[in-house]
Swiss-Prot record:
The gene is ATPC. Disulfide bonds join 240-246. PANTHER family: ATP SYNTHASE GAMMA CHAIN, ATP SYNTHASE GAMMA CHAIN, CHLOROPLASTIC. Disulfide bond; Cys-240 and Cys-246 are known to form a disulfide bridge in the dark which gives rise to an inactive enzyme. Activation can be brought about by a ferredoxin-dependent reduction of the disulfide bond in the light. Residues 25-36 have a biased composition (Low complexity). Keywords: ATP synthesis, CF(1), Chloroplast, Disulfide bond, Hydrogen ion transport, Ion transport, Membrane, Plastid, Thylakoid, Transit peptide, Transport. The lineage of its organism: Eukaryota, Viridiplantae, Streptophyta, Embryophyta, Tracheophyta. Residues 1-41 form a transit peptide. GO terms for molecular function: proton-transporting ATP synthase activity, rotational mechanism. This is ATP synthase gamma chain, chloroplastic. It is a peripheral membrane protein.
Length: 364
């Protein structure tokens, strides 16, 4: 009996360490399970969802890039094809206007008045996802408005484009004369509607100067917001306010256009150079004032149409560049997420193998 009792007690004491080890092993496994299986599974699902989302976004940005590339080619051709006519028309008008400066001729669109109020046309895009295209233009508009306020000159805005319309509607402190929505393809009819409003404002003397702020198309990777004096048409520049101060913008496009060797060039340091005389082949049977009156509406329409075309080409080029960068970034993000997914999946498999090995060792 004593031996039996001592043997039973020795067996019970023999099993105590094993029982302790087996009860301690599960907590280790239990602490490992939440950190591997549930959380890692959640991470894997999240990574899979993110990879799928990035793939879908990449498809969208790639498609938008291709669409913008197809459209910008047509817009670029319209800009390039329209520039010779517009520049030649401006050159002819400059020459005629300069000849008429010495004569007592009343041409409303060339009449230089003391500037009390300026109409600022702001040409923006209709859509977003084009990088900083619209923001850069609107910042330049705000800068020009601040300059006019500093000079003490009143102003009003003619907004063209849905993005600009939304921007100025949210700022009721900025006076806006009219809002115009842009189109996917600017036409002469659309430009004529804007020109009629500008013409009535200037001829009725509601404004004394009309400036046009738009984005000039330079190349597929570069576009510059520029200010262009639309009215009055004056090759001499230096349009002044009631105090005699020049109200022309420092980077005014029109008053930096001069002729050099018979071609229009841009001279920042010169307002005007000697203009060559008309070719002897050109002969005008009518009075120059009548011709100027007939050409000025065409000039107004062509300049507005050109600004709309250049703005559209710049917007499409900016969108193509932005979507190209977005596609590249999505591709890089997809690679990074795939690497993280593979690492998490490998860690999950390794953890499961370690659990199996630990369980097998515990059963031995």
């Amino acid at each position: 009996m004593a031996c039996s009792l001592s043997f039973s007690s020795s067996v019970s004491t023999f099993h105590l360490p094993t029982t302790t080890q087996s009860t301690q092993a599960p907590p280790n496994n239990a602490t490992t399970l939440p950190t591997t299986n549930p959380i890692q599974c959640a991470n894997l699902r999240e990574l899979r969802d993110r990879i799928g989302s990035v793939k879908n976004t990449q498809k969208i940005t790639e498609a938008m890039k291709l669409v913008a590339a197809a459209k910008v080619r047509r817009a670029q051709e319209a800009v390039v094809n329209g520039r010779p006519f517009s520049e030649t028309l401006v050159e002819v008008l400059y020459n005629m206007n300069e000849q008429l400066q010495t004569e007592d001729v009343d041409v409303p669109l060339t009449k230089i008045r003391t500037v009390k109020k300026v109409a600022l046309m702001v040409v923006t895009g209709d859509r977003g996802l084009c990088g900083g295209f619209n923001n850069m233009l609107l910042k330049k508009a705000e800068s020009r408005i601040a300059e006019l306020k500093k000079l003490g000159v009143d102003y009003t805005i003619i907004s063209i484009g849905k993005k600009g319309n939304t921007y100025f509607i949210r700022r009721p402190e900025i006076p806006v004369d009219r809002y115009f929505d842009g189109t996917n393809l600017p036409t002469a009819k659309e430009a004529q509607a804007i020109a009629d409003d500008v013409f009535s404002l200037f001829v009725s003397e509601e404004v004394d100067k009309v400036e046009m702020l738009y984005t000039k198309f330079v190349s597929l990777v570069k576009s510059d917001p520029v200010i262009h004096t639309l009215l009055p048409l004056s090759p001499k520049g230096e349009i002044c306010d009631i105090n005699g101060k020049c109200v022309d913008a420092a980077e005014d496009e029109l008053f930096r256009l001069t002729t050099k060797e018979g071609k229009l060039t841009v001279e920042r340091d010169m307002i005007k150079t000697e203009t060559p005389a008309f070719s002897p082949i050109l002969e005008f049977e009518q009075d120059p004032a009548q011709i100027l009156d007939a050409l000025l509406p065409l000039y107004l329409n062509s300049q507005i149409l050109r600004a709309l075309q250049e703005s559209l080409a710049s917007e499409l080029a900016a969108r193509m560049t932005a979507m190209s960068n977005a596609t590249d970034n999505a591709n890089e993000l997809k690679k990074t997420l795939s690497i993280n997914y593979n690492r998490a999946r490998q860690a999950k498999i390794t953890g499961e193998i370690l659990e199996i090995v630990a369980g097998a060792n515990a059963c031995v």
